[in-house]
Amino acid sequence: MTVGLYLYGIFPEPIPDGLVLQGIDNEPVHSEMIDGFSFLYSAAHKEKYLASRRYLICHEKVLETVMEAGFTTLLPLRFGLVIKTWESVTEQLITPYKTQLKELFAKLSGQREVSIKIFWDNQWELQAALESNPKLKQERDAMMGKNLNMEEIIHIGQLIEATVLRRKQDIIQVFRDQLNHRAQEVIESDPMTDDMIYNAAYLIPWEQEPEFSQNVEAIDQQFGDRLRIRYNNLTAPYTFAQLI
């Protein structure tokens, strides 16, 4: 039993039926043209979908399949968006935001979003920071085994934190220097885990991704085993498709 329509994204052109065989709940995916905008959708079995790994992957896979077929300009919609009627889309989205939607399509045309997430080993970096600063290491070692007052604890903690932060910023600056000038736009987001030190998305010309990927690989080789770099070269442009 269906209770509405599950929406995946908006395109500036019709998407052929059958391009994506299955979407959420194994339902076939279709497109609906409304006032010049093509909405990718499938029948919804629920009014609200939990953000399970299976559902999230399916949502992303639908958009990626369409992108791989050549429909690369799109505005992805958030996971779990279910509507009752197309009239609600017109009233709540198209009518109030039509100009902004067209501006976003113009901005994203011929562009793609890629992203990097950089991880390091916190404990290794802490030890390396101390080894690179003999004076700090000597001061830290001299305090070990002693009953320190709060002021002393804060003092040595701040010195160590500042040293580690400089190492982190030096790494991040390498990525900025070598990648930012290749992008039309860069958005840096907060790290998502304790061992993640950098999280950035880049809007780049579609055909320049291979060159961008080579730059990421060169940086990876520069740092060797010190870093783990997670590079995503095919993702719907969530970061750059925000309605203001």
Swiss-Prot record:
Sequence segments annotated as region (C-terminus, modifed ferredoxin fold): 110-233
Region C-tail, annotated ranges: 234-244
Key words of the record: Gas vesicle
Pfam families: GvpL_GvpF
Major localization listed first in the record, in broad terms: other
GO cellular component, one term: gas vesicle
Superkingdom: Bacteria
InterPro entries in alphabetical order: GvpL/GvpF
Localization: Gas vesicle
Keyword Magnesium: no
Region (N-terminus), start-end ranges: 1-109
Domain comment in the entry: Has 2 domains with the C-terminal tail tucked between them. The C-terminus adopts a modified ferredoxin fold. GvpF from bacteria has an insertion compared to archaea (residues 122-160).
The family this protein is said to belong to: Belongs to the gas vesicle GvpF/GvpL family.
Subunit: Binds GvpA.
Miscellaneous information on this protein: In this organism gas vesicles are about 120 nm wide and 500-1500 nm long, with regularly spaced ribs running nearly perpendicular to the long axis.
Role, per record: A minor component of the gas vesicle, may be involved in preventing GvpA aggregation during gas vesicle nucleation. Gas vesicles (GV) are hollow, gas filled proteinaceous nanostructures. During planktonic growth they allow positioning of the organism at a favorable depth for light or nutrient acquisition.
Protein's recorded name: Gas vesicle protein F
Organism: Microcystis aeruginosa (strain PCC 7806)
Lineage summary: Bacteria, Bacillati, Cyanobacteriota, Cyanophyceae, Oscillatoriophycideae
Gene encoding the protein: gvpF
